[in-house]
Amino acid sequence: MIKHIFFSLLFFLTLNASLASPAILGMRERAEVIDHWLQTRVSTVLPELMKRSQIDMWVLISREYNEDPVIRTFLPSTWQSARRRTILLIYNPGNDQPLETLAVARYDVGDIFKKAWDKELHGEQWKRLADLIEERDPKRIGINYSETFALADGITKTEYDLFHQTLPNYLRERVVSAE
């Protein structure tokens, strides 16, 4: 009798819990939610973070299979990793204007980061990045390096050196940690 009551109670509690649980979204619906939140973060949270950190421009550089931990949070839901070399450039023009979000890559990176490099038109990828930075003339350029916070230390030594060599001297002095 006690077993019968116990299993009946267990059955009803399980049934009640399953009825109260939200439905699990399908893959497409999940992707839409993820991409929506990415757009929301980029348009509302990121401008305030950049303003508070006094960073006009944030450059995220990552290579396929060796991603910066932060870049993954900016990739669209359908991407699992960076492709070849993915460079995202986020520029805050100030005066409460929306952020400019560019991909120095051969393709758009989702709906947010628009393609800003055509190899046939612009030549080398690093040169194009330097041109885009010079055109915007930011006061402070954040990149992901840090001595104290591992997740903010995503740029590799090679990528850092190539980035540094690409910039003219006056812009090199403006590079800061984006931690």
Label for each model-derived stretch:
Residues L19-E179:
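A composition/biophysics-driven feature that prefers long, compositionally simple stretches
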